[in-house]
């Protein structure tokens, strides 16, 4: 699933090609995403000038003159710029045609993504209750410490809760906990403030590094230019169960936490 760095990489890739452009047409080949694409999307977006391309959590907000297109990439979605005349392949469900002769093409093999229209996107039910951005000024380890008091749930699903902080998915939660030396199974309420301060720093550092590397390409993700990300080369634990720890050489363990695979080092993480 594309996580925050992959979505931000996509935003940075498509923004220069969209802002200031006018939409000439929206071609929808298949409306059946996680929620059906609005039947009037072509009417709403055609003729509109695109004013900004923003991100909130894992949602892309393509702001036009009279509203905003909310896009979620789901499990396997991607957005990239193509020549408007290029034929669509299987799973390429939507083209937003631009006056420049390019098209913003949405591909989603598993169709778990979304394209929705909103006049007030930040008040939309999908975005209104989200926590702070992990790279913003409202997030730090103190917030994690405060919200964790009295919580018995494991720390990994705690930091993956979008009400606590957005965009810390399975890949980056695993990597941040390893970097901070925290066992992902440890109860959130049992972790000291000092360790949470370290964890907050590692979340910010690792997400920033992943964005710089263009995200993590594990299966379907490509950036807005169609190129893969390279952060997978930096992974210490995610997807490496049974392999050796790059820090101490012991065997990494794989467990299930909150219905997700979690890999950790029993020697480095306490």
Swiss-Prot record:
Keywords: DNA damage, DNA repair, DNA-binding, Glycosidase, Hydrolase, Lyase, Metal-binding, Multifunctional enzyme, Zinc, Zinc-finger
Record family assignment: Belongs to the FPG family.
Positions annotated to bind DNA: 91, 110, 151
EC numbers on record: 3.2.2.23, 4.2.99.18
BP GO annotations: base-excision repair
Matching InterPro entries: DNA_glyclase/AP_lyase_DNA-bd, DNA_glyclase_Znf_dom_DNA_BS, Formamido-pyr_DNA_Glyclase, FPG_cat, MutM-like_N-ter, Ribosomal_uS13-like_H2TH, Znf_DNA_glyclase/AP_lyase, Znf_FPG/IleRS
Protein name stated in the entry: Formamidopyrimidine-DNA glycosylase
Active site: 2-3, 58, 260
Cofactor(s) the protein needs: Zn(2+)
Species per Swiss-Prot/TrEMBL record: Stutzerimonas stutzeri (strain A1501) (Pseudomonas stutzeri)
Keyword Disulfide bond on entry: no
Function: Involved in base excision repair of DNA damaged by oxidation or by mutagenic agents. Acts as a DNA glycosylase that recognizes and removes damaged bases. Has a preference for oxidized purines, such as 7,8-dihydro-8-oxoguanine (8-oxoG). Has AP (apurinic/apyrimidinic) lyase activity and introduces nicks in the DNA strand. Cleaves the DNA backbone by beta-delta elimination to generate a single-strand break at the site of the removed base with both 3'- and 5'-phosphates.
Segments forming FPG-type zinc fingers: 236-270
Subunit structure: Monomer.
Catalytic activity: Hydrolysis of DNA containing ring-opened 7-methylguanine residues, releasing 2,6-diamino-4-hydroxy-5-(N-methyl)formamidopyrimidine; 2'-deoxyribonucleotide-(2'-deoxyribose 5'-phosphate)-2'-deoxyribonucleotide-DNA = a 3'-end 2'-deoxyribonucleotide-(2,3-dehydro-2,3-deoxyribose 5'-phosphate)-DNA + a 5'-end 5'-phospho-2'-deoxyribonucleoside-DNA + H(+)
Cofactor-binding details, from the entry: Binds 1 zinc ion per subunit.
UniProt-recorded Gene Ontology molecular function terms: 8-oxo-7,8-dihydroguanine DNA N-glycosylase activity; class I DNA-(apurinic or apyrimidinic site) endonuclease activity; damaged DNA binding; zinc ion binding
Keyword Phosphoprotein in annotation: no
Coiled coil: none
PROSITE patterns, sorted: FPG_CAT, ZF_FPG_1, ZF_FPG_2
């Amino acid at each position: 699933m594309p996580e925050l760095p992959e979505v931000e990489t996509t935003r940075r890739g498509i923004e220069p090609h969209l802002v200031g452009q006018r939409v000439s047409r929206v071609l929808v080949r298949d409306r059946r995403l996680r929620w059906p694409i609005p039947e009037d999307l072509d009417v709403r977006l055609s003729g509109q000038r695109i004013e900004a391309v923003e991100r909130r959590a894992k949602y892309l907000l393509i702001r036009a003159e009279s509203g905003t297109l909310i896009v979620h990439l789901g499990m396997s979605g991607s957005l990239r710029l193509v020549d408007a005349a290029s034929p669509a392949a299987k799973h390429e469900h939507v083209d937003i045609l631009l006056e420049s002769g390019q098209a913003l093409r949405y591909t989603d093999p598993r169709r778990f993504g979304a394209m929705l229209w909103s006049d007030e996107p930040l008040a939309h039910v999908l975005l209104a209750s989200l926590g702070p951005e992990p790279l913003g000024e409202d997030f730090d380890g103190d917030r994690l410490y405060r919200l964790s008091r009295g919580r018995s749930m494991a720390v990994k699903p705690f930091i993956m809760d979008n009400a606590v902080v957005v965009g810390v998915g399975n890949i980056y939660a695993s990597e941040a906990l390893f970097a901070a030396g925290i066992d992902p199974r440890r109860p959130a309420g049992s972790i000291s403030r000092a360790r949470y301060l370290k964890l907050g720093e590692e979340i910010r550092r690792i997400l920033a590094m992943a964005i710089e590397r263009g995200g993590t390409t594990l299966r379907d993700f490509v950036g807005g230019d169609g190129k893969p990300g390279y952060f997978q080369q930096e992974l210490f634990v995610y997807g490496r169960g049974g392999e050796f720890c790059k820090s101490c050489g012991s065997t990494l363990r794989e467990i299930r936490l909150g219905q997700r695979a979690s890999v950790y080092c029993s020697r480095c993480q306490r």
